[in-house]
Curated annotation (Swiss-Prot):
It is linked to Myoectodermal gonadal dysgenesis syndrome: An autosomal recessive disorder characterized by 46,XY complete gonadal dysgenesis and extragonadal anomalies, including typical facial gestalt, low birth weight, myopathy, rod and cone dystrophy, anal atresia, omphalocele, sensorineural hearing loss, dry and scaly skin, skeletal abnormalities, renal agenesis and neuromotor delay. The keyword Metal-binding applies. Residues 273-308, 341-376 form the EF-hand domain. One of its GO terms (cellular component) is actin cytoskeleton. CDD domains: PPP2R3C (cd21505). It comes from the Eukaryota. This is Serine/threonine-protein phosphatase 2A regulatory subunit B'' subunit gamma. May regulate MCM3AP phosphorylation through phosphatase recruitment. May act as a negative regulator of ABCB1 expression and function through the dephosphorylation of ABCB1 by TFPI2/PPP2R3C complex. May play a role in the activation-induced cell death of B-cells. Interacts with MCM3AP/GANP. Interacts with PPP5C, and the phosphatase 2A core enzyme composed of the PPP2CA catalytic subunit and the constant regulatory subunit PPP2R1A. Finds in a complex with ABCB1, TFPI2 and PPP2R3C; leading to the dephosphorylation of ABCB1. Keywords: Calcium, Cone-rod dystrophy, Cytoplasm, Deafness, Disease variant, Metal-binding, Nucleus, Repeat. The keyword Cytoplasm applies.
Amino acid sequence: MDWKEVLRRRLATPNTCPNKKKSEQELKDEEMDLFTKYYSEWKGGRKNTNEFYKTIPRFYYRLPAEDEVLLQKLREESRAVFLQRKSRELLDNEELQNLWFLLDKHQTPPMIGEEAMINYENFLKVGEKAGAKCKQFFTAKVFAKLLHTDSYGRISIMQFFNYVMRKVWLHQTRIGLSLYDVAGQGYLRESDLENYILELIPTLPQLDGLEKSFYSFYVCTAVRKFFFFLDPLRTGKIKIQDILACSFLDDLLELRDEELSKESQETNWFSAPSALRVYGQYLNLDKDHNGMLSKEELSRYGTATMTNVFLDRVFQECLTYDGEMDYKTYLDFVLALENRKEPAALQYIFKLLDIENKGYLNVFSLNYFFRAIQELMKIHGQDPVSFQDVKDEIFDMVKPKDPLKISLQDLINSNQGDTVTTILIDLNGFWTYENREALVANDSENSADLDDT
């Protein structure tokens, strides 16, 4: 066969015929079929050669997309059923009363004052009679955990019952919070926690006096405390476990007590007086009534002695709208200044002081902020204090690992972070620190005068 015949046959093949040229979609489909075929063969071969692949757990479960409505509904329904089942496993009020009756019946003499006690033998007897739901509480580990210094080897019935009550409450609360966990990943987003607190308000007698028009501001005030302290990386979500582990939820649910003292309400961030105080301060600062705070308006916060340099940094680093601060950003500012001993608050202020974004404060940073304090002292007719003296005092207080740099961890470890930050940002705070000995002496004299009378 000569080359002309070979060429003629080649040109006549269906693959090269213009009329039968494959479309782009057909080529993609063919490529996908081949990929699937070879991938399946390879996967099958690997599975047969290595049995360990059967025991490796699955690490990733894809969440349903927004357009996969059926999968979303199925996931929500299955989670609801699971949480209902978990809820039924908890002790109800009647079962708790029965447990208390059994414990009281099996107490082991002698009593210590009015404290009823129980030994391990009777402890196990109560566990057998209390039912399957209580089995998890009647273990040697729990008994040993509550065993202290009793010479008869007993534990307090009241302490054990409180332990059970606390465990039941934690599980109930976990289930309640999980109902708002839309993604089912063990986290609550800001909107999830807002919904939880909004639906919780009617169950808290101490909040009965709040007008419904204030609910949105109250919810914002409450939620910000959770996120400010529990979400330091600002991911927009916090673990349900972290919510349960901290005291904030206890403070919030304390508002169920109808006889809560005035002092307790004043120190509780979640109380109605506290929320109204914070919101009232915001309204008082907002002189132009546009719902936002400018730098000039914020400068009147507290004793109105914060430096302009510090306020400049606040508006440079914090989220603002056309150069003004909204209520949510203001709440972070208040939480930081009112809790300066806390690591989360120090992290907030440290970021503002770290003007070079180096992760530490050096002599330049300290001098940059203290110069503004010196200027305010001149304006108020006070003699400026030498920066060198203040700088030496700060480094002596903090005792950083590096003698020329102060890190955030150095501030936290020193337990002097609140004092150091106050010295650098607030004239009134610096004056209080500078005259601390005179103030202590004055307090002592006043105390002595009161004792004499």
